[in-house]
Amino acid sequence: MSFKMTQNQYTSLYGPTVGDSIRLGDTNLFAQIEKDYAVYGEEATFGGGKSIRDGMAQNPRVTRDDVNVADLVISNAVIIDYDKVVKADIGIKNGYIFAIGNAGNPDIMDNVDIIIGSTTDIIAAEGKIVTAGGIDTHVHFINPEQAEVALESGITTHIGGGTGASEGSKATTVTPGPWHIHRMLEAAEGLPINVGFTGKGQATNPTALIEQINAGAIGLKVHEDWGATPSALSHALDVADEFDVQIALHADTLNEAGFMEDTMAAVKDRVLHMYHTEGAGGGHTPDLIKSAAFSNILPSSTNPTLPYTHNTVDEHLDMVMITHHLNAAIPEDIAFADSRIRKETIAAEDVLQDMGVFSMISSDSQAMGRVGEVITRTWQVAHRMKEQRGPLDGDFEHNDNNRIKRYIAKYTINPAITHGISEYVGSIEPGKLADIVLWDPIFFGVKPELVVKGGLINSAVNGDANGSIPTSEPMKYRKMYGQYGGNLTSTSMTFVSKTAYENGINRALNLKRMVRPVKNIRQLSKADMKNNSATPKLDVDPQTYEVYVDGEKITSNAATELPLTQRYFLF
């Protein structure tokens, strides 16, 4: 006869199942389980008296040579991804995800997709949430410690430019020229995350751009501090089309070389990644935001203006002055800073993210943004928009799955697609690098419990090393074995251009990390942005800066209180 238990009993043992909902941190968002891959009564769990034992859920005879035998199983996890909210086991082998389904011993269990053998380790995720490692595509490489801070927030990939604490790096996400690109590729060998570097996109001589792509740059950054002229942008796009790389644009705030319409005329119908499309981080005053309506523009915005709060405007004036090397004694520099900080367009930014008009969220690290707050601020925006705008179509009480899928795509799959790395990272799918973040639901979006990088635990909350148990205080983030010895290079990827990859940049520089080429970029359009592909008509009133979507004014109220804030940072 079958054994019956209550829903609460089941959840306490194996985690939530179909129809159950999980609150994300202290937000107003609830994820509801859409599917459970487990066979009820045959769940694989680890521990004393549990089922993952020899001859039970662990197969006693198979070896690692069997393709279905996992090196690592993350058991009974709630997977939140751009296309699913499911309960499943995750099978990892050789550092890659090879299956999502039901783990156990097929000799005695039904519908087993992932075999647990004597060579398999277990991460118990009952009652926990698993997400793909986040991708930050607007990183100023100013300080190597950014990587560790980002990793401890759930980010596992950085894309951008810089060479350290130079003025060019502080202001622009640029690694200029072959020599700097090579040195940064070598420096990346010591970082615990995936990286890709963008070169400088300002040159009328295409050879000066091509040599950077050949050196390993995964794209070019056109930035107003170097001169974001229509000519420079057009030349950069010509090279991008030839070599299948991305162009990231920080447009012309002062409209010195033309207006938003002139920039779009130079772009024509070619795809590019528009940085901080809201305009506060830079770009055509006051209407850069209109570019998000174009089907060839892949728009992102950065976390310092997200979500809109009563402190946002005041904070930004000082940040602009410092980041862009401005002088408070020069009236024109003050005017430059003032022109970028428009509360009306900032207030519209949250709404455009919620509507799926803006497709991505990134940091703008140490150049007006915070490298460890991409994920936190993403979910704060989602909370605020549910609070102000109500549930999205298809969502209902205790089920915000559509909004959750929209927002998680903004820092996982969409950045990966935009920069040509979605074959490798960006989602929890078979065939992708096992960059996986495990969360206690109470701390979701703020403090991960552990981060798996390339199939190995890279960072985790752990206790005193002299403690009798792993939870002895002080509990804090600690480097795990994924950051030691050869694992530092064998579990992370360095992304380069296809031409650099084919010409053996890894051998030329003696790189030990997994080197992979970016690809499939130039044919992209906004329609490729998962859950964030809306292209409505956008207008900005040139006098009031008010933003209109299909003729309707949009705005949001400045928040005075947010979730995922001080109660999580008392210690």
UniProtKB/Swiss-Prot annotation:
GO cellular component entries: cytoplasm
SUPFAM superfamilies listed in its UniProt record: Composite domain of metallo-dependent hydrolases, Metallo-dependent hydrolases
Which residues make up the binding site for Ni(2+) 1?
A: H138, H140, K221, D364
Q: InterPro entries attached here? A: Amidohydro-rel, Metal-dep_hydrolase_composite, Metal_Hydrolase, Urease_alpha_N_dom, Urease_alpha_subunit, Urease_AS, Urease_asu, Urease_asu_c
Q: Which GO molecular-function terms appear in the entry?
A: nickel cation binding; urease activity
Name what cofactor the protein needs.
Ni cation
Residues that bear N6-carboxylysine: K221
Keyword tags: Cytoplasm, Hydrolase, Metal-binding, Nickel
Q: Which domain of life is it from?
A: Bacteria
Reaction catalysed by this chain? urea + 2 H2O + H(+) = hydrogencarbonate + 2 NH4(+)
* Places the protein is found: Cytoplasm
A GO BP term here is:
urea catabolic process
**Residues that hold Ni(2+) 2 according to the record:** K221, H250, H276
The record's family statement is: Belongs to the metallo-dependent hydrolases superfamily. Urease alpha subunit family.
What NCBIfam families is this protein classified in? PRK13207.1, urease_alph
> What name appears for this protein in its UniProt entry?
Urease subunit alpha
